[in-house]
Amino acid sequence: MLTWTPLESNPEVLTKYIHKLGVSPAWSVTDVIGLEDDTLEWIPRPVKAFILLFPCSETYEKHRAEEHDRIKEVEEQHPEDLFYMRQFTHNACGTVALIHSVANNKEVDIDRGVLKDFLEKTASLSPEERGRALEKDEKFTADHEALAQEGQTNAANHEKVIHHFIALVNKEGTLYELDGRKSFPIKHGPTSEETFVKDAAKVCKEFMARDPNEVRFTVLALTAAQQ
């Protein structure tokens, strides 16, 4: 498996990254400093996605396996334009979460560049084929590596990274968890433009509740850029 340098959960670096990929400067990645109602009010609006970084603990891996076995028995329907891709490149989860966040929000303008080219090239492909396409995309690899090196902690490629990024988005009134390590998108119930922030925060709290002794969680959001 190809290994990339892991991205830091640094909103400034991630904002620079999405802009380099072609996302309009009108959008940025922002820290979510708390998940209670009063702190959620501080997040710049509109909020188009939550990005959660969490530890892949034994408890979480057990939950993931049980969830997979439960959902694979059900033929769930998803919107045709839900963009979902698998992750086959080690440490690419940050990039995959950003792709999921941007690609599932038509309001987020993307100029011609690496990301737009990738989305157009993979539009008709399966989630697995999209993951393989990213693995072979030399431009995406180069951009990821360049920005990953700007993080506050330059983790070496051979280090074992136990944290993982996922995206939470509102797609046609359903809150989706998009995780390239999983075989399919995960539905977390109904949501709306007005309730998305609180609904996504609730899902983040559920991740934290599964590992009550763990503190290594980071929550970010794709939002309108602050003026």
Curated annotation (Swiss-Prot):
Active site: 93, 164
Feature type site, description Transition state stabilizer: 87
Record-listed E.C. numbers: 3.4.19.12
Record's catalysed reaction(s): Thiol-dependent hydrolysis of ester, thioester, amide, peptide and isopeptide bonds formed by the C-terminal Gly of ubiquitin (a 76-residue protein attached to proteins as an intracellular targeting signal)
CDD domains (UniProt xref): Peptidase_C12_UCH_L1_L3
Enzyme class: hydrolase
Residue ranges of the TM segments: none
One Gene Ontology CC term in the entry: cytoplasm
Cystine pairs: none
Superkingdom, natural source: Eukaryota
Keywords, ordered alphabetically: Hydrolase, Protease, Thiol protease, Ubl conjugation pathway
InterPro entries: Papain-like_cys_pep_sf, Peptidase_C12_UCH, Peptidase_C12_UCH_sf, UCH_AS
Site (Important for enzyme activity): 179
Chain ranges of the UCH catalytic domain: 3-224
Molecular function in Gene Ontology: cysteine-type deubiquitinase activity
Family: Belongs to the peptidase C12 family.
Listed name of the protein: Ubiquitin carboxyl-terminal hydrolase
Organism: Drosophila melanogaster (Fruit fly)
